[in-house]
Amino acid sequence: MKVYEGGRSLDGAVVTVDGELLDPRFDIRRFSRMGFEWTYEGDGPRQLALALLADHLGDAQRALALTEDFMRDVVAELDNAWRLTSADVEAALRPLPPSPLPRGEGEH
């Protein structure tokens, strides 16, 4: 089971997965130039939601499709220092609607 942890230091917000820095997944989409944030709704929390979901799901498109709801329901509610397990992430995904295509996908 993976363990995701976030906290703040003099260097800013730091997020790890199993003790290693979490990849922000700018290759999928760049929401924030400033990196990760949490405790509110916005671009930094959106980047964290995408990174957590991409790591957990192993599916970039599904992660992108679920980012907004996961950011609002989970990331915006995290404390300054937090810990989530892969089981916590999975439990948070259960009540979310099935992942639609990201905006702009499938439109012709």
Where are these regions (language model features)?
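Short, compact, well-ordered microdomains
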Residues: 58-96
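Long, low-hydrophobicity ectodomains and other hydrophilic envelope-associated domains
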Residues: 1-2
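A cross-taxon signal for low-complexity, glycine/charged-rich
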Residues: 103-108
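Amphipathic alpha-helical packing elements
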Residues: 6-7, 11-69
